Amino acid sequence: MRVMERIEAVYAIAQHRAAYSPEEDAAHELAAGWMREAGLEVSRDVAGNLFGTRGDARVWVGSHLDSVPTAGRFDGVLGVVAAIEAAARLPDRPLAVVA
């Protein structure tokens, strides 16, 4: 299952990915690659948020890739990975994935 494999790939970077840390940056780079594979245009804003967009997006979905020490492997990353998977399965729909 691709969703679980991707969650494990992010978790393998580090269990704890503090905001603005090298570990969170690595998770963003991994997610950016998956967004491109899903046909999304990837960008970052000045605050460091990662966006994958297609078309005139009116629906935004996603979550966060940083975590706290005791949050567990699904904290934040599940929402990001699920949103990327939805984008991959809906190639003709305008949407945005936010991480």
Predicted features by range, described:
Residues 10-13, 52-54, 86-91:
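Alpha-helix C-terminal capping segments
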Residues 61-64, 70-99:
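Alpha-helical metal-binding/catalytic segments enriched in His/Glu/Asp
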Residues 56-60:
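Active-site beta-strand-loop-beta-strand hairpin of nuclease catalytic cores
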Residues 3, 24-28, 76:
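Generic structural signal for well-ordered, non-membrane alpha-helical segments
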Residues 1-21:
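N-terminal capping segment at the start of a domain
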Residues 16-55:
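A non-catalytic alpha/beta surface segment that caps or lines the substrate-entry region
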Residues 15-16, 66-68:
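A short, flexible beta-alpha/helix-coil linker loop
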